Structure formats: C-alpha cells, structure tokens
A protein has these predicted regions:
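Phosphate- and other anionic-substrate recognition elements at nucleic-acid/protein interfaces
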Residues: 1-9, 13-156
Length: 156
C-alpha cells in the first residue's frame, strides 16, 4: 500500500463532498462540503495542495447495469478539469455505486435527522467512496480506478 493522504470527491448537483484518508491509506473520513459551481475546482485544488495529497479519487456514477449517463459525463468533466489544475497529482475515477445510499444509512443509524444529513451526506458519501478505493488498492496492490488522461504522473 502506498503511503500518502488521498482525497475523494463526490460531485453532486448542489454540493461537492470531500473525504480524506490518513497518511497510511487505512481509513477514510468525511472532510469538507463545497458548494458546487463557481470556485469549487479552485477549492479542490487548494485542498489537494494543503493536504499534500498523493492522489484524488473522483466518484464515477454508474448504474446497476454498468451504464454511465449524464451524471457520469459531468463527473468525467470535473475530473478532467481538476486534473489539469493539480497536475502532476493523479486524478482517478472510481465507481461510486451505492455511496450516497450507504452514507444516508450510516448517518441515519448515527441518529442524524433528514435535515442534519442533508448538509453532511455528500462528505460522508465521499468517505464511503474513498474507503472502497483504499480497500480496492489493498486487495489488488494497484492504484484504484481509472487514471484520468492528462492527470500527470502515476503515483508509485
């Protein structure tokens, strides 16, 4: 397992959830929620620098049948734009099926009501995404997901 902090990004239509791993890549935690739109990529680039991120994982919405629709196209666009801003830090796309559903369930079990969940579910979904990516790397011995073209170096 490569050492270094990883960030994960769950892009929603209103908010962008961000999660962060520990330096050993064992545990993912919700980190920040950013309003989607003007300035969101700037903030993601700042976080990448501030956290000295090894890589950034962007959630790729995929249907149960494995198809990618409009949301996946939007996620790919965000990933490409982010990759151009933070190069040479790699950006990877990773399947985000069930992340929001799982995050809602975990928050509900933790006693959060619907209103409280709304503000943090995006970061919690990013944490679910990042934990899955970390577990995937641990199981396979390879960086998770699909490297975004033009994203710079591949982290060793």
């Amino acid at each position: 397992m490569r050492r270094g902090v990883r960030l994960a990004v769950d892009v929603g239509s209103v908010r962008v959830g961000v999660a962060r791993s520990d330096p050993d890549g064992v545990l993912a935690s919700p980190f920040e929620v950013i309003r989607h739109g003007r300035g969101d990529l700037d903030r993601l680039a700042e976080l990448t620098t501030e956290q000295d991120a090894l890589e950034v994982i962007v959630g790729l919405p995929t249907t149960l049948a494995g198809r990618q629709g409009q949301a996946a196209t939007a996620a790919r666009q965000v990933a490409a734009e982010l990759a151009a801003r933070i190069a040479p830090v790699p950006v990877r796309l990773f399947d985000e099926r069930f992340t929001t559903t799982t995050a809602h369930a975990v928050l509900r079990q933790g006693g959060k009501n619907a209103k409280a969940r709304r503000g943090i579910v995006d970061a919690a979904a990013a944490a679910v995404l990042l934990q899955a990516a970390l577990d995937n790397e641990r199981a396979t011995g390879h960086p998770p997901g699909e490297l975004v073209p033009g994203a710079g170096r591949i982290a060793p």
